[in-house]
């Protein structure tokens, strides 16, 4: 893994703007260690509770291997997408899912680019059994769900790979819903807290730039500006 830079470099407003590094338009920022990377997805209680207990996403029959599953490495984007777990019952539990780096990068190597959630229709999901991994770049969000001028990656795992992902590539599952709710409550009380302060309070994870080979960057169109 090449040298990574804290997401603090991109979110915290410093006094001298000229000293800040500009954030590339397309960049993966994630929580990871030497062996694994964390991605997020929100599920209903009937799926999430058994998944955490048994450390298997398909522990419940409600988890459908026949559907495309979307995951994202950005905590703030997951908060936006799920409404901090309050959006609806199908997203009431936010799970932090750990994958080994080689499996995560293998998913990315199979990717084709889409251009937004609106393109992921039920027909496309049904075709997912024979589809490639789908990647889209959506506007990154602040912890308070404000839109940022650069993009965050979302990864659609097709049905053809879902069973392998669930059975072999997921190495850890944690329910982080209470952290999401605590973040929302804290921001409702004080919206001026910095990223650093939220990290210190353990309300958001520290995310770093996730470096990729030039070949993977080309697959993901990471040098595109729109």
Task: Outline where the language-model segments fall.
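ADP-ribose/NAD+-binding catalytic cleft of ART/PARP-like enzymes
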Residues: 4-65
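Partner-binding and oligomerization surfaces adjacent to conserved cores of proteins
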Residues: 21-22, 26-42, 55, 81, ...
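Non-catalytic, substrate/partner-engaging modules appended to enzymatic cores
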Residues: 31, 35-38, 130-134, 150-152, ...
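Structured loops at beta-to-helix junctions and adjacent beta-edge loops in soluble globular domains
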Residues: 41-43, 100, 138-140, 156-160
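ADP-ribosyltransferase catalytic core
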Residues: 61-141
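Internal, well-ordered alpha/beta segment that forms a basic, Gly-enriched binding/recognition surface
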Residues: 135-137, 142-149, 155
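Glycine-rich, aromatic-bearing surface loops/beta-hairpins
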Residues: 166-226
């Amino acid at each position: 893994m090449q040298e990574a830079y804290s997401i603090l470099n991109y979110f915290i407003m410093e006094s001298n703007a000229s000293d800040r590094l500009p954030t590339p338009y397309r960049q993966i920022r994630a929580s990871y260690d030497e062996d694994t990377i964390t991605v997020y997805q929100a599920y209903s209680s009937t799926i999430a509770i058994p998944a955490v207990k048994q450390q298997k996403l398909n522990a419940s029959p409600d988890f459908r291997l026949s559907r495309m599953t979307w995951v994202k490495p950005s905590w703030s984007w997951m908060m936006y997408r799920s409404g901090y777990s309050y959006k609806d019952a199908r997203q009431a539990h936010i799970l932090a899912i750990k994958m080994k780096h080689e499996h995560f990068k293998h998913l990315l190597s199979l990717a084709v680019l889409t251009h937004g959630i609106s393109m992921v229709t039920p027909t496309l999901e049904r075709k997912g059994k024979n589809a490639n991994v789908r990647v889209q770049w959506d506007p990154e969000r602040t912890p308070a769900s404000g839109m940022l001028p650069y993009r965050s990656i979302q990864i659609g795992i097709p049905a053809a790979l879902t069973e392998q992902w669930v059975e072999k590539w997921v190495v850890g599952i944690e329910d982080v819903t209470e952290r999401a709710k605590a973040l929302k409550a804290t921001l409702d009380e004080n919206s001026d807290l910095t990223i650093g302060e939220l990290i210190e309070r353990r309300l958001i994870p520290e995310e770093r730039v996730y470096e990729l080979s030039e070949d993977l960057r080309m697959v993901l169109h990471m040098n595109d500006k729109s």
